């Protein structure tokens, strides 16, 4: 275990005891790793090992890292460390997400740009150059941050989505989709950001909870007058529609009803209104409590009726418009049961209008403002125009006066409304031309391949991710922007000679354009043009469409684009040897592991899966952790303005990275829950694990700083127990880490620190004082193995402990402990754990009755099944609890009784009506427990999972229950004068031991004592004189009046001299 190049040194000598300065210790480790190049050594030692493929999702480097990155980064460090110790080679290549609107918006902010026209004025080349510089602005800060959190990554071999090689793989992927018929252009209604002047994909609206924000909008109920036709019964009546987007009313081209809904024609004053019968009560204020119903119709009866639109702008030009159409999407949950249709501004609207050949009208420009086709509102932003549109309808002024639409109700409607996840402005829905991936063509296959992925938490597979896949829609991948990978589509500029060319490589571009691009970004790629080969006149030109890819297409291409596949590394990626096509080698696709927060189920996880299915017909990854969200101290989203979270750097400087790592990793957040960051929570993690481990190491360093070796062949029961307990920890940690249950692994480690420090070390203290070799070697072995087991979870503190104990180079260059290295003894573990439970329960009784630990008590009854197995440990229990007599018994029912409860939810489906009879019997206390674990409850027998039990003490004042109802302990708290005297002596022993420490004596130093005792305590002191002397290592112990004395307690004064 030792190495002369790395001699054993007490690395934490100045930090032992009290309160170690963990940040200072961590700084030592980080410096050591840097100088030793330990990370590269950990990779190199596995050069010939099988690989474990980890995909590191690329962050943006134009902003500083936050708690979300910190949390995910810890997981990205823990899993590769564990897999490396298990014998795998795990490359940890860092990547940077550099394209897209996040980068553009940051540059716009820096340059004071407020709209796209300013970008066009400055020039695309200049703007994109500013983006290129901006996206890598904080790389040094990122590297410092990642290094400080003790995360090992390869920055030197990083990839960037702006690299030419990366972008070539991205356009290759699109060309593959095009060749498979899975990419197409279409005119559709999409979520649209008027601030950024580009559409979004539907999955971007579902990534974060805060994309939908509560918003108040004006809602209007409006009547459109029915025109004459073949049926005259409704002429002059008003079709009532309800909308929360009044700005779309100038674009109205139809209304929709549900064919199977019942509608009524009612009279209100001198007007008639048509609406769904189910919505009458909602409009009682306007129509009356019992309006006169003139006629009743099915929705199907209303189809084809024509009406006058609320505005005249498109009345003459729109074909097949202004009629009642069928719509299965129409409901009677709100509104009137009749839906206003503006095809350019609603998905259902466009689909409904398309069926009858209604061509959408689009009077709103790319900035979200009305154009000249609606002169009354020209230049007004749609949200600002709402107020004037409503005023005109109410006052029957302007264009709204022509067709006589009736404004029946104007109200404020509060509802969740989508906002741009990048600029945070409210979106609109708008018909635009976009390029799509035909996800619906292979959606079922995506659902099938999802079953091959292991998800943590497990419910994500068929829950949030699986359900999203089932409803997946075609993905809009084009963005009307500048800084991104260009969509490699060239079109003829003459519609009379149409042609589309799609390119998937630099070679293909060079072949057709005669030049090999060295930069695929705009505007350089836009400059590649050529004559249209299909135009015999030779006048038309092939020009690239101006769009760039959705940034999620970039990141979804990461597995292959990072290695420039298929242009390079195809053997590495696919797992075939180029020299021998029949020889299979390690494939690097799919990846073995990825992790991000749960929102990526509709972001990166989703786009990875889409492209993997479409391109390779397999998943992109085998295992995925989708963790919860980190919240501020007030339970809300973290906010710099609210200052509702502690500064990460301050936590690192005060508590250290391992403390933060433990707090995050041990929490429920890795099982899908959310986590509130609190400083007390971080410190509690230190108290639970870091300090106990450090104190155990300090204990060994104090008593045996230069000795101790690996040793498991021991005879003392406490040594055997802690080694067997360590074997259990090894198995439990291995099981948890194999399934990426990191929080479960943390819990196992936390549970181990209790028996290690509060049982083994405390019960073995005297053996260490005596320099017992077995005890020293056992603790050495436990610390060496525990450091290895905890190394992925606490890489910094374990490095110090392991190197100090062994003298080795690094704990992170060791192997994961094997099962056969440690002696397993499940029987000993079970019985000693029960001994500890007995002691814990009895100690709780002492505490509740305010009986100090050093006061002896006469008797403890331990009532448990198979109580005799505790007999060898009676002395240990008595000594631990300071109780004179331990009585063992199997007669639990003498001291308590079991109360049973039927689990009706589990038992009901099997028992039917009999479950009620069982409940009645059990409530009456007549249930009978059977040896096989079943419970007889009257006419039925309940299985173990169909009921629960609770052990209730007969005399709770003196009785405590053991965990899981396994037994009871009953404490006799009678205190005799003899017991009180012994307790007094033990109190003085503790005070004298503290005095020894105070004056700086070594634990082995002998002393002489002169003690002055009050007269009423003199007899107690004489009786227990030898006992006190022996415990404090006094070779001389006399009574008298010391000249130079110290008061220690209960009127006692002493003088103490080293021999």
Swiss-Prot record:
Family annotation (SUPFAM superfamilies): Anticodon-binding domain of a subclass of class I aminoacyl-tRNA synthetases, Nucleotidylyl transferase, ValRS/IleRS/LeuRS editing domain
Reactions catalysed: tRNA(Ile) + L-isoleucine + ATP = L-isoleucyl-tRNA(Ile) + AMP + diphosphate
Motif ('HIGH' region): 59-69
Main location: cytoplasm
Residue ranges that the Swiss-Prot or TrEMBL entry lists as coiled coil: none
The keyword Disulfide bond belongs to this UniProt entry's keyword annotation: no
GO BP, sorted A to Z: isoleucyl-tRNA aminoacylation
Motif interval(s): 'KMSKS' region: 637-641
Record-level Gene Ontology MF annotations: aminoacyl-tRNA deacylase activity; ATP binding; isoleucine-tRNA ligase activity; tRNA binding; zinc ion binding
Stated name of the protein: Isoleucine--tRNA ligase
Protein species of origin: Mycobacterium leprae (strain TN)
Phylogenetic classification of the source organism: Bacteria, Bacillati, Actinomycetota, Actinomycetes, Mycobacteriales
Record gene name: ileS
């Amino acid at each position: 275990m030792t190495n002369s190049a790395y001699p054993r040194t007490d690395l934490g000598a100045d930090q032992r005891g009290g309160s170690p300065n963990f940040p200072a210790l961590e700084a030592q480790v980080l410096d050591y790793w840097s100088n030793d190049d330990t990370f590269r050594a950990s990779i190199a030692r596995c050069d010939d090992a099988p690989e474990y493929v980890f995909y590191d999702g690329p962050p943006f480097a134009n902003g500083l890292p936050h708690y979300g990155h910190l949390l995910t980064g810890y997981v990205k460090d823990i899993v590769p460390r564990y897999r490396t110790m298990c014998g795998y080679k795990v490359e940890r290549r860092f990547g940077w997400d550099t394209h897209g609107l996040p980068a553009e918006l940051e540059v716009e902010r820096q340059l004071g740009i407020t709209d796209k026209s300013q970008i066009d004025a400055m020039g695309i080349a200049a703007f994109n150059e500013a983006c290129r510089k901006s996206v890598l602005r904080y790389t040094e800060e990122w590297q410092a941050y990642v290094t400080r959190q003790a995360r090992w990554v390869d920055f030197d071999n990083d990839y960037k989505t702006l690299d030419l090689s990366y972008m070539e793989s991205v356009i290759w992927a699109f060309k593959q989709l095009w060749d498979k018929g899975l990419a197409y252009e279409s005119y559709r209604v999409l979520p649209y950001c008027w601030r950024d002047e580009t559409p979004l994909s539907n999955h971007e609206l579902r990534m974060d909870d805060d994309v939908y924000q509560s918003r108040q909008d004006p809602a209007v109920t409006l009547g459109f007058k029915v025109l004459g036709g073949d049926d005259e019964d409704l002429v002059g009546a008003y079709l009532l529609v309800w909308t929360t987007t009044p700005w779309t009313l100038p674009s109205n081209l139809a209304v929709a009803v549900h064919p199977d809904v019942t509608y009524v024609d009612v009279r209100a004053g001198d007007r008639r209104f048509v609406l769904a019968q189910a919505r009458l009560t909602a409009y009682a204020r306007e129509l009356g409590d019992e309006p006169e119903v003139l006629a009743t119709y099915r929705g199907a009866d209303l189809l084809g009726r024509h009406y006058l639109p609320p505005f005249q702008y498109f009345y003459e030009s729109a074909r097949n418009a202004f009629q009642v159409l069928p719509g299965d999407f129409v409901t009677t949950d709100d509104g009137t049961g009749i839906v206003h249709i503006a095809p350019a501004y609603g998905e259902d609207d466009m689909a409904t209008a398309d069926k009858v050949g209604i061509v959408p009208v689009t009077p709103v420009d790319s900035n979200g403002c009305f154009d000249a086709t609606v002169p009354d509102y020209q230049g007004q932003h749609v949200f600002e125009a709402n107020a004037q549109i409503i005023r005109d309808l109410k006052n029957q002024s302007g264009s709204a006066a022509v067709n006589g639409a009736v404004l029946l109700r104007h109200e404020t409607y509060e509802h969740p409304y989508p906002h741009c996840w990048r600029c945070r402005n409210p979106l609109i829905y708008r018909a635009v031309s976009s390029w799509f991936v035909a996800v619906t063509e292979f959606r079922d296959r995506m659902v099938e391949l999802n079953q091959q992925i292991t998800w943590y938490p497990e419910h994500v597979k068929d829950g949030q991710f699986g359900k999203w896949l089932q409803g997946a829609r075609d993905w809009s991948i084009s963005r009307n922007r500048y800084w991104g990978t260009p969509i490699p589509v060239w079109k003829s500029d003459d519609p009379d000679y149409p042609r589309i060319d799609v390119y998937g490589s630099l070679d293909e571009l060079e072949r057709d354009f005669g030049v090999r691009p060295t930069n695929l970004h705009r505007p350089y790629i836009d400059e590649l043009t050529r004559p249209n080969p299909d135009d015999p006149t030779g006048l038309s030109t092939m020009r690239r469409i101006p769009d760039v890819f959705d940034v999620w297409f970039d990141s979804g291409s990461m597995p292959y684009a990072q290695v420039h596949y298929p242009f390079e590394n195809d053997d590495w990626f696919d797992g075939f040897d180029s020299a021998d096509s029949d020889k299979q080698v390690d494939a690097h696709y799919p990846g073995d592991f990825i992790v991000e927060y749960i929102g990526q189920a509709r972001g990166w996880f989703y786009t990875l899966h889409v492209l993997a299915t479409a391109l390779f017909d397999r998943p992109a990854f085998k295992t995925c952790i989708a963790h919860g969200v980190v919240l501020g101290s007030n339970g809300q989203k973290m906010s710099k303005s609210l200052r509702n979270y502690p500064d990460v750097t301050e936590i690192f400087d005060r508590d250290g990275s391992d403390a933060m790592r433990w707090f995050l990793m041990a929490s429920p957040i890795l099982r899908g829950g959310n986590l509130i960051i609190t400083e007390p929570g971080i410190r509690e993690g230190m108290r639970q694990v870091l300090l106990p481990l450090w104190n155990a190491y300090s204990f060994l360093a104090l008593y045996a700083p230069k000795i101790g070796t690996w040793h498991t062949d021991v005879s003392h029961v406490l040594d055997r127990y802690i080694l067997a307990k360590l074997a259990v920890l090894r198995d439990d940690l291995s099981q948890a880490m194999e399934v990426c249950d990191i929080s479960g692994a943390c819990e196992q480690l936390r549970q181990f620190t209790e028996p290690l420090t509060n049982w083994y070390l405390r019960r073995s203290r005297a053996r260490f004082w005596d320099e017992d070799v077995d005890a020293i070697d056992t603790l050495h072995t436990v610390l060496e193995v525990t450091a290895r087991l905890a190394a992925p979870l606490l890489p910094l503190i374990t490095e110090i402990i392991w190197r100090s104990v062994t003298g080795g180079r690094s704990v992170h260059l060791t192997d994961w402990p094997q099962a056969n290295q440690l002696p397993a003894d499940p029987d000993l573990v079970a019985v000693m754990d029960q001994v500890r439970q007995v002691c814990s329960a009895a100690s709780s009784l002492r505490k509740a009755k305010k009986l100090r630990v050093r006061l002896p008590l006469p008797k403890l009854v331990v009532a448990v099944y198979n109580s005799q197995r505790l007999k060898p440990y009676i002395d240990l229990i008595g000594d631990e609890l300071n109780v004179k007599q331990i009585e063992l018994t199997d007669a639990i029912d003498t001291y308590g009784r079991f109360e049973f409860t039927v689990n009706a939810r589990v038992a009901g489906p099997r028992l039917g009506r009999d479950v009620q009879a069982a409940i009645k019997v059990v409530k009456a206390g007549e249930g009978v427990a059977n040896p096989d674990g079943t419970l007889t409850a009257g006419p039925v027998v309940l299985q173990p999972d169909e009921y629960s039990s609770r052990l209730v003490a007969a005399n709770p004042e003196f009785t405590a229950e053991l965990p899981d109802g396994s037994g009871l302990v009953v404490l006799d708290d009678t205190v005799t004068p003899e017991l009180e005297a012994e307790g007094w002596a033990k109190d003085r022993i503790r005070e004298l031991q503290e005095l020894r420490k105070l004056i700086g004596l070594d634990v082995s130093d002998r002393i002489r004592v002169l003690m002055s005792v009050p007269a009423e305590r003199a007899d107690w002191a004489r009786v227990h004189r030898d006992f006190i002397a022996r415990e404090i290592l006094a070779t001389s112990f006399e009574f008298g009046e010391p000249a130079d004395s110290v008061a220690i307690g209960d009127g006692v004064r002493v003088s103490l001299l080293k021999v």
